[in-house]
Regions:
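Short, flexible active-site-proximal loops enriched in glycine and acidic residues
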Residues: 55-58, 89-93
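Mixed-charge interfacial surface used for oligomerization/domain docking
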Residues: 2-8, 13-30, 34, 67, ...
Length: 172
């Protein structure tokens, strides 16, 4: 967690979400080391290390459970460590890492603006419901070109507009 952050709760995630280490540090976000390949004991040790740094609660954001076992591993880590599990809030982002990066930015902004742990957890749940990326399996599917005269916006432009719309949202 960034040293300039004086909050009482940490935001952690299971992957860097396409963000650079310096960006994650600026957001005050910690990444569970090797979370996508970790076992429950390693994740439990990571959570304990966060608590030993003086943090009282942890908001732990994870890749969509259908794509990764990291949320299941985090749940097992909480079950194996009942003394700290009540202070950890696990969130299934319902998304791939790109959208999680947007969620991390919003959660960090909420924390910096003084949001309580409970409010940040509720916000994380709300973001998980509304921030979504599309995942399309392309198993030999032939796509046709639209005969529409107006070309549609690229996925990148749509994500940029979504990011801008979410970033300008003054939720808290």
């Amino acid at each position: 967690m960034a040293s300039s952050d004086c909050s009482t709760f940490a935001i952690v995630c299971d992957n860097p979400c396409g963000l650079e280490a310096s960006q994650l540090e600026a957001l005050g976000v910690s990444v569970i080391p090797g979370a996508l390949n970790s076992d429950a004991d390693q994740v439990g040790e990571f959570y304990r290390g966060i608590f030993e740094s003086g943090v009282q609660k942890i908001l732990s954001l994870h890749v969509y459970a259908d794509f990764s076992d990291s949320l299941l591993t985090a749940k097992k880590a909480c079950q194996n460590n009942p003394d700290i599990s009540s202070s950890i809030f696990l969130v299934d982002s319902g998304n791939m890492p790109t959208a999680m990066g947007i969620m991390l930015e919003r959660l960090s902004a909420a924390r910096k603006s003084g949001a309580s742990f409970e409010a940040a957890c509720a916000y994380a749940q709300e973001l998980a419901e509304v921030v979504a990326t599309m995942y399309i399996a392309m198993n030999k599917v032939v796509l046709h070109k639209s005969k529409d005269k107006h070309p549609r916006l690229s996925l990148r432009l749509r994500l940029e507009r979504l990011h801008r719309r979410i970033s300008n949202d003054m939720y808290l």
